[in-house]
Curated annotation (Swiss-Prot):
It is an enzyme of class 1 (oxidoreductase). It catalyses: L-methionyl-[protein] + [thioredoxin]-disulfide + H2O = L-methionyl-(R)-S-oxide-[protein] + [thioredoxin]-dithiol. The active site is at C114. GO terms for molecular function: peptide-methionine (R)-S-oxide reductase activity. GO terms for cellular component: cytoplasm. The lineage of its organism: Bacteria, Bacillati, Bacillota, Bacilli, Bacillales. Belongs to the MsrB Met sulfoxide reductase family. Residues 2-125 form the MsrB domain. Pfam families: SelR. Its EC number is 1.8.4.12. The gene is msrB. Keywords: Oxidoreductase. This is Peptide methionine sulfoxide reductase MsrB.
Length: 142
């Protein structure tokens, strides 16, 4: 499993995950990335999302219709910037991931997890076994 020490984070990774920042839309690594695989927490390495639930939302950030395991996601009320939103954080590392909204694809449950690329790392399907995520291969065989 991939893990990263907080001292190894880039400036934007630190700002996003530790200071609740947001990276610019359309100028981040995974907003338009649709390869087969999983997305893990940048710090803990815990699997959070799969490419099977990723969709193109036109918001400029990676969007997913559901989390791989709801127990790995913490939801908190976020009243910053004069808005009321639902913040999502990773359970194990308590890193800020982004927000979840109720405007996702209805056929997939209606949720849109809007996630900062700086908070996650993509693991290609072909590398799942090698990197310790072999138990997730079955999610793609449905």
């Amino acid at each position: 499993m991939l893990k990263k020490d907080k001292s190894e984070l880039t400036d934007i990774e630190y700002i996003v995950t530790q200071e609740n920042g947001t990276e610019p839309p359309f100028m981040n690594e995974y907003w338009n990335h649709f390869a087969k695989g999983i997305y893990v927490d940048k710090i803990s390495g815990k699997p959070l999302f799969t490419s099977e639930e990723k969709f193109h939302s036109e918001c400029g950030w990676p969007s997913f219709s559901k989390a791989l395991d709801d127990d790995e996601i913490i939801e908190l009320v976020d009243k910053s910037f004069g808005m009321v939103r639902t913040e999502v954080r990773s359970e194990e590392s308590n890193s800020h991931l982004g927000h979840v909204f109720n405007d996702g694809p209805k056929e997939s449950g209606g949720l849109r997890y809007c996630i900062n690329s700086a908070a996650i790392q993509f693991i290609p399907y072909e590398k799942l076994e090698e990197l310790g995520y072999g138990d997730l291969i079955s999610h793609f065989d449905k």
